[in-house]
Amino acid sequence: MAELATIARPYAEALFQSAKPAELAGCLEQLNELAQLAALPEVAALSNNPKVSADDLSKLLSGMVKTKLDGKVASFLNLINQNHRLAAVPEIAHQFEAMKNKSEGAAEVSITSAFPLEGSALNDLLSSLKKRFGGKELRPTIQVDPTLIGGVRIQVGDEVMDSSVKAQLAQMQASLGA
């Protein structure tokens, strides 16, 4: 995984630096579509087939996306295919999104709860998280995982806060076993 991140970083940085601030959202949307395609086993098999040229693969993928690729992303896709780096596109999209969020003073927050969070409970949680992270705009992704038993698990960047019952039970088990 670290190797893929290392491969992806220069590509993500190059695309990010070439895009104007107004183009970032569109580039990210197109990158995410390409990432979904790159993750398909059939597309991976095509990209590894020596009989399929980089140009043909780029044309095929450009035709498969819902959104027409703009010039920067189309050139980027061609470069990726010429360098046989299609497998890195999901990680490139992830890093591009992180760069976009950083430039906008925002952060992705992943909230996993044992039960659905709605209304005031969700708003209160987001409000306290916003204070904790210096007033950054938070872009939440909310998931429900009943195996947590109770509580929430929150991840912002590389920081994880886990107040779930499952985590507390694991801590107790570890301390009793020691």
Swiss-Prot record:
Membrane topology summary: Peripheral membrane protein
Classification via InterPro entries: ATP_synth_OSCP/delta_N_sf, ATPase_OSCP/dsu
One GO MF term attached to the UniProt entry: proton-transporting ATP synthase activity, rotational mechanism
Cellular component annotations (GO), alphabetically ordered: plasma membrane; proton-transporting ATP synthase complex
Chief localisation class: membrane
Places the protein is found: Cell membrane
Keywords: ATP synthesis, Cell membrane, CF(1), Hydrogen ion transport, Ion transport, Membrane, Transport
Family designation: Belongs to the ATPase delta chain family.
NCBIfam families, per the entry: ATP_synt_delta (TIGR01145), PRK05758.2-2 (NF004402)
Assembly and oligomerization: F-type ATPases have 2 components, F(1) - the catalytic core - and F(0) - the membrane proton channel. F(1) has five subunits: alpha(3), beta(3), gamma(1), delta(1), epsilon(1). F(0) has three main subunits: a(1), b(2) and c(10-14). The alpha and beta chains form an alternating ring which encloses part of the gamma chain. F(1) is attached to F(0) by a central stalk formed by the gamma and epsilon chains, while a peripheral stalk is formed by the delta and b chains.
Protein role: F(1)F(0) ATP synthase produces ATP from ADP in the presence of a proton or sodium gradient. F-type ATPases consist of two structural domains, F(1) containing the extramembraneous catalytic core and F(0) containing the membrane proton channel, linked together by a central stalk and a peripheral stalk. During catalysis, ATP synthesis in the catalytic domain of F(1) is coupled via a rotary mechanism of the central stalk subunits to proton translocation. This protein is part of the stalk that links CF(0) to CF(1). It either transmits conformational changes from CF(0) to CF(1) or is implicated in proton conduction.
Protein name, entry field: ATP synthase subunit delta
The encoding gene: atpH
